[in-house]
Every structure is written in structure tokens, then in C-alpha cells.
């Protein structure tokens, strides 16, 4: 018997960032006011060897006004080459992840407990930086 769980029925799934090229990208700001847990999934298709830094920011408003980096480390998983493997390897808990320079498609998952966000900051976004315009992220 399968476990009675369905992602579309038991979770709120959103696309916070449409696939696009760019060196500095910020996703939508998503309210976690009623969430028990959030997973931020990032696909990075590196077309250039520049290292990409992926981080999470918190804000008191869905407009993003007053945003600051998260301060509590969160669990992170990484698939270094999603074209050849589906293995997600747990990384050291952190507030950001710097990807390697390999020209591969990478999958990164951040697991966020909204209770660990700064008091009054219940909105989350994902930011990519230190990248290159040839790198595609979603």
C-alpha cells in the first residue's frame, strides 16, 4: 500500500522564478505565514563556469521591502549533475550554497522551517548572485 500523500493535494506548489538567464536573480517573495515547512528547489543550468551563489532572504512584506538574509542555517541537498544522476547529497546546513564551476545542470533543495525565520519576517525569497548571464536558473 502506498503512503497516502499527494504533492498537489497536500502541499502548496508555486513557481517563484521562471526559467531565465541572468547573473543576479531574485524569485518572488512568498508568504510562509500558514506554512509548517517550505522547500525551495532551484535548477541551475550552468552555461558558463562562473560560480553561482544561491541564498535565501526573508522579508516582513510580500513586496520584499525590508528583506534581509536568513540567519539560521537550513538543511541543503545538492545534485551536482542532474543530467547523469538523480542523487541528492546532503550538504552542511547553511544560509547559502556556492555551486562548483562545472558546466552541468544542478538541482539544489533548501528545507526551511518558518519558525526559524526572524520574528516578524514570514516571507521568503531565493537569490542567485556571483553568476554569469549565460547561466540559466529556475
Where do the protein language model's features map onto the residues?
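Surface-exposed, low-hydrophobicity beta-strand/loop segments enriched in small/polar/acidic residues
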Residues: 1-138
Amino acid at each position: 500500500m502506498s503512503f497516502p500523500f499527494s504533492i498537489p493535494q497536500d502541499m502548496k506548489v508555486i513557481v517563484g522564478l521562471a526559467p531565465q538567464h541572468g547573473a543576479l536573480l531574485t524569485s518572488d517573495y512568498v508568504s510562509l505565514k500558514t506554512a509548517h515547512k517550505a522547500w525551495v528547489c532551484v535548477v541551475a543550468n550552468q552555461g558558463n563556469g562562473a560560480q553561482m551563489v544561491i541564498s535565501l532572504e526573508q522579508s516582513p512584506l510580500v513586496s520584499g521591502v525590508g528583506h534581509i538574509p536568513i540567519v539560521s542555517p537550513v538543511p541543503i541537498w545538492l545534485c551536482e549533475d542532474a543530467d547523469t544522476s538523480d542523487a541528492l547529497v546532503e550538504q552542511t546546513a547553511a544560509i547559502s550554497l556556492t555551486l562548483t564551476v562545472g558546466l552541468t545542470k544542478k538541482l539544489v533543495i533548501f528545507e526551511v522551517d518558518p519558525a526559524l525565520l526572524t520574528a516578524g519576517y514570514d516571507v521568503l525569497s531565493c537569490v542567485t548572485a556571483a553568476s554569469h548571464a549565460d547561466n540559466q536558473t529556475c
